[in-house]
Amino acid sequence: MPYLDRNGVRLAYSAEGTGPAILLSHGFGLTRRMWQGQVEHLKDRYRVITWDFRGHGESDYPSDPDLYSMEQSIADMTALMDHLDVDKAIVGGLSLGGYTSLSFYAAHPERCAARLIIDCGP
């Protein structure tokens, strides 16, 4: 399992396939593995990137509450894209992942080829 080190916090991720990038973020209490069915169907045409938020799945669980915020999540997504040499991606997610993807778009519209927002509240 590959990890990205973000100032001492390890973030688990996977990147499968080739083609335009899709960055998918999971819902609260879930993990990147929730996307496995979609990854299997998309990886022949896309580079599908999934990741575990801080405090989820195989990523680290920092004890400092200041290390959890929307700004941190946006910075984590940006760092992951940079780490994987992805300039622009279809950015999407479910629930918390959808809300975070919208926030990422608001902060970095130039890095979003499109948005895929699923079951996300206002």
Question: Which residues does each predicted region cover?
Answer:
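Active-site loop/oxyanion-hole signature of alpha/beta-hydrolase fold enzymes
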Residues: E40-K43, I49-G92
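Alpha/beta-hydrolase fold catalytic core
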Residues: M1-I22, D44-R47, V86-D87
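Conserved hydrolase catalytic core segment
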Residues: D87-P122
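Active-site glycine-rich loops that stabilize anionic/oxyanionic intermediates
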Residues: G19, G27-L30, S95
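Alpha/beta-hydrolase active-site loop signature
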Residues: G29, F53-G57, P122
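Short N-terminal helix/helix-N-cap motif within the alpha/beta-hydrolase-1
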Residues: R32-Q36, E58-Y61, Y99
